[in-house]
């Protein structure tokens, strides 16, 4: 009898057919090939009105993407699932929330200068504002078979918000912004996204400030005996004087109220990071604004403002700034003799 019972049970195992799921453990859809499809969206947005280049400006639906690429997914359902229902879609943001909501759309931090809101097309006429859940994908139906659809990240709209004004381009590196999941129930979307959406490119404001032709950028300090630097750490060598640097700019599309700040970047002296490196460890150059404030290279908070004129045409205004440069001893030692020079790069930023 024991042998007969064992054979009977074995027969029950091999005789069972169809799909069964424990409890509610069914519903999530997965990519047909097991691999999430990645949509990459190129961003090239222009802002012709420079007055919009201020913190808080919202640029709704400025990019509409549609690449026509279908994705394939499969949704497994139990045999008891007789009445076909629309596939449900969930859109998850992969960015930190910024706290901004405009017209029911949530914005997320994209870069230091931009936030983004994403609106993904999930059927012919239905869009999901990321984040969303339990949205019906009306054209995506079927159970236990491969479903092919363009409405899973292949089209959508992007909106941007400016958090910090910028000059020229605000570059967006390749950034994952959203993932899409699908399910036949609203209880479980699984852990494997059907698709993802990444963006890269730039938002451009047609405004700039350029150095006027003929502006002198070389600053000669003259010749000094090595002894002039000795025991004068942080001070100019004996006989040295501050040299003026007068910079003039042509600025276009800089609207009233916008401030343009100047800062420095470049190699600095190892013993005094305030000083521009001059190729000699005992010598450096400090750059100051007209008020005497030292502009520390590579310090984003160490800035000074350009003096902007009023508009002299519809889009143009002049800008100028007076800086002072002075050589110093960075160690108090007598430097070795030679000819030395240094380079620093000027950057302009909107405020």
Swiss-Prot record:
Record organism: Escherichia coli O157:H7
What name does UniProt use for this protein?
Probable minor fimbrial subunit LpfD
Q: Which UniProt keywords apply?
A: Fimbrium, Signal
Q: What does this protein do?
A: Part of the lpfABCC'DE fimbrial operon. LP fimbriae may participate in the interaction with eukaryotic cells by assisting in microcolony formation.
Instruction: Specify the superkingdom.
Output: Bacteria
Instruction: Give an example GO cellular component term for this record.
Output: pilus
Protein's GO biological process: cell adhesion involved in single-species biofilm formation
Q: Per the record, a Pfam family?
A: Fimbrial
**Signal peptide limits:** 1-22
């Amino acid at each position: 009898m024991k042998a007969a019972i064992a054979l009977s049970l074995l027969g029950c195992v091999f005789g069972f057919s169809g799909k069964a799921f424990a409890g509610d453990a069914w519903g999530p859809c997965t990519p047909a090939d097991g691999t999430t499809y990645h949509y990459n969206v190129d961003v090239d947005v222009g802002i012709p009105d420079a007055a919009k280049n201020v913190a808080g400006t919202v640029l709704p639906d400025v990019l509409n993407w549609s690449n026509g690429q279908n994705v394939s997914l499969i949704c497994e359902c139990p045999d008891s699932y007789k009445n076909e229902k629309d596939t449900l879609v969930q859109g998850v943001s992969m960015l930190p929330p910024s706290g901004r909501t405009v017209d029911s759309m949530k914005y997320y931090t994209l870069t230091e200068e931009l936030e983004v809101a994403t609106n993904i097309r999930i059927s012919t006429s239905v869009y999901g504002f990321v984040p969303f859940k339990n949205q019906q994908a009306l054209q995506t139906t079927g159970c236990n078979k491969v479903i092919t659809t363009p409405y899973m990240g292949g089209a959508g709209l992007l909106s941007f918000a400016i958090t910090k004004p910028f000059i020229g381009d605000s570059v967006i590196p390749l950034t994952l912004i959203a993932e899409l999941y699908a399910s036949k129930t609203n209880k479980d979307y699984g852990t494997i996204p059907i698709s993802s959406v990444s963006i890269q490119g730039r938002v451009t404001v047609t405004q700039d400030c350029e150095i006027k032709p003929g502006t002198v950028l070389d600053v000669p300090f003259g010749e000094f005996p090595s002894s002039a630097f000795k025991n004068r750490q942080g001070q100019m060598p004996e006989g040295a004087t501050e040299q003026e640097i007068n910079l003039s700019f042509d600025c276009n599309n800089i609207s009233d109220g916008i401030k343009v700040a100047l800062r420095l970047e470049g190699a600095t002296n190892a013993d005094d990071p305030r000083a521009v490196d001059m190729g000699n460890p005992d010598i450096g150059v400090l750059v100051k604004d007209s008020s005497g404030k030292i502009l520390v290279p590579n310090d984003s908070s160490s800035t000074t403002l350009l003096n902007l004129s009023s508009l002299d045409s519809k889009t143009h205004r002049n800008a100028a700034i007076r800086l002072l440069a002075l050589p110093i001893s960075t160690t108090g030692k007598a430097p070795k003799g030679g000819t030395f020079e240094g380079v620093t790069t000027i950057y302009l930023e909107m405020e």
